[in-house]
C-alpha cells in the first residue's frame, strides 16, 4: 500500500502579527511549523504503516525551498519519501490553484492507494484544498475524519459531526481529511532526525508536473486576498455580584434594560 500525505509549512500563528499600515502578515522572524492537522494526517499514515508491513508513506508539499525543512521533519517521524513542489510560478496561489498543483504532483507519483490531508491549514482556515484535490483526481473523499481502519481495499472511517460521528465505508483509492481528535502525532527520534538528513527530497517545478505557468499560482487563482487585519480589541466583561441568586439576576436584568438589550 502507498499512502501520500499532503502537508504544509505554515507560520506559527502564536507569533503572527499584522502590519497595521499594509494589512499584510509580517513573516520576518516568525517561526514556521508543520501544519497541526497535517501532522495528524501523517501520524495516521504512519500508524497504518506500522500495522501493515510493506506500506510506504510519501509526503508532498507545495512551497518555497525552505519548506524542505518541514519535509525533513516528516521523514524523521517515519515517512519514506518526500516531494517538494517549488516554483515561482506557484506563488500567490489560492486554494483552487494550490489543489491543481498538488493534484498534478500526485498524478506524477506512481500509484497511490490513499491520500491523507489535514482538515485545514491554520494560516488560511479554508478547509477547501483536500476536497478540491479529490475532485481533480476523481477520488471519493471523506472530510473531518477522526478514526481510520483499512480492511480489504477499503477504508472504514468515523466522520466527525456536531453531535457525534458517522461511520462511512469507502473504497480505495480515496482521500481523507483528518482532524486533531484522530491521534497524537509522534515525536521525532534522534536516529530519525539523523537519517532524515541523509534522505533525498525530490523537487519538481511546473514543467516537471506538466503545468503551464498560466495553470498555476496567481495566474490560475480566481480569488485573491485583498486585506488581512486584526479585529479590534473588545472591552473587558463586567462581573455582577450579589448575596443571593435573585439579587444577581435582578442586577443583570436591570443592566440589560439600560443597554436596551431587553
UniProtKB/Swiss-Prot annotation:
GO cellular component labels: cytoplasm
Cell location: Cytoplasm
Cofactor list: FAD; AMP
Catalytic reaction equation(s): hydrocaffeoyl-CoA + 2 reduced [2Fe-2S]-[ferredoxin] + 2 NAD(+) = (E)-caffeoyl-CoA + 2 oxidized [2Fe-2S]-[ferredoxin] + 2 NADH
Cited PROSITE patterns: ETF_BETA
InterPro entries with a match to the protein in the record: ET-Flavoprotein_bsu_CS, ETF_a/b_N, ETF_b, ETF_beta_N, Rossmann-like_a/b/a_fold
Note on how the cofactor is bound: Binds 1 FAD per subunit. Binds 1 AMP per subunit.
Top-level lineage group: Bacteria
Keywords, sorted A to Z: Cytoplasm, FAD, Flavoprotein, NAD, Oxidoreductase
Enzyme Commission number(s) of this protein: 1.3.1.108
GO terms for MF: electron transfer activity; FAD binding; oxidoreductase activity, acting on the CH-CH group of donors, NAD or NADP as acceptor
Record carries keyword Flavoprotein: yes
UniProt-listed PANTHER family: ELECTRON TRANSFER FLAVOPROTEIN BETA-SUBUNIT (PTHR21294), PROTEIN FIXA (PTHR21294:SF17)
Role: Caffeyl-CoA reductase-Etf complex catalyzes the reduction of caffeyl-CoA to yield hydrocaffeyl-CoA. It couples the endergonic ferredoxin reduction with NADH as reductant to the exergonic reduction of caffeoyl-CoA with the same reductant. It uses the mechanism of electron bifurcation to overcome the steep energy barrier in ferredoxin reduction. The electron transfer flavoprotein (Etf) mediates the electron transfer between the different donors and acceptors. The complex can also reduce 4-coumaroyl-CoA and feruloyl-CoA.
Family: Belongs to the ETF beta-subunit/FixA family.
Record text on subunit structure and interactions: Part of the homotrimeric caffeyl-CoA reductase-Etf complex composed of (R)-2-hydroxyisocaproyl-CoA dehydratase CarC, and the electron transfer flavoprotein (ETF) alpha (CarE) and beta (CarD) subunits.
Protein name as annotated: Caffeyl-CoA reductase-Etf complex subunit CarD
Gene expressing this chain: carD
Amino acid at each position: 500500500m502507498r499512502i501520500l500525505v499532503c502537508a504544509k509549512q505554515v507560520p506559527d500563528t502564536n507569533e503572527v502579527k499584522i502590519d497595521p499600515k499594509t494589512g499584510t502578515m509580517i513573516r520576518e522572524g516568525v517561526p514556521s511549523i508543520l501544519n497541526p492537522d497535517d501532522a495528524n494526517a501523517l501520524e495516521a499514515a504512519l500508524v497504518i504503516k506500522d500495522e501493515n508491513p510493506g506500506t510506504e508513506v510519501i509526503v508532498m508539499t507545495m512551497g518555497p525551498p525552505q519548506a524542505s525543512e518541514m519535509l525533513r521533519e516528516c521523514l524523521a517521524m517515519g515517512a519514506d519519501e518526500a516531494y517538494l513542489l517549488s516554483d515561482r510560478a506557484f506563488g500567490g496561489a489560492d486554494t483552487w490553484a494550490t489543489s491543481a498543483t498538488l493534484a498534478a504532483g500526485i498524478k506524477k507519483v506512481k500509484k497511490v492507494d490513499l491520500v491523507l490531508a489535514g482538515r485545514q491549514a491554520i494560516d488560511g482556515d479554508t478547509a477547501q484544498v483536500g476536497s478540491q484535490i479529490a475532485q481533480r483526481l476523481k477520488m471519493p473523499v471523506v472530510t473531518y475524519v477522526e478514526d481510520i481502519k483499512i480492511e480489504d481495499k477499503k477504508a472504514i472511517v468515523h466522520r466527525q459531526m456536531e453531535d457525534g460521528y458517522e461511520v462511512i465505508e469507502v473504497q480505495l483509492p480515496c482521500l481523507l481529511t483528518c482532524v486533531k481528535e484522530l491521534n497524537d502525532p509522534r515525536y521525532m527520534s534522534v536516529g530519525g532526525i539523523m537519517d532524515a538528513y541523509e534522505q533525498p527530497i525530490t523537487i519538481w517545478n511546473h514543467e516537471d508536473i506538466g503545468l503551464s505557468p498560466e495553470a498555476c499560482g496567481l495566474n490560475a487563482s480566481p480569488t485573491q486576498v485583498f486585506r488581512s487585519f486584526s479585529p479590534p480589541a473588545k472591552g473587558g466583561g463586567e462581573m455582577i455580584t450579589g448575596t443571593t441568586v435573585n439579587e444577581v439576576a435582578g442586577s443583570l436584568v436591570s443592566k440589560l434594560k439600560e443597554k436596551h438589550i431587553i
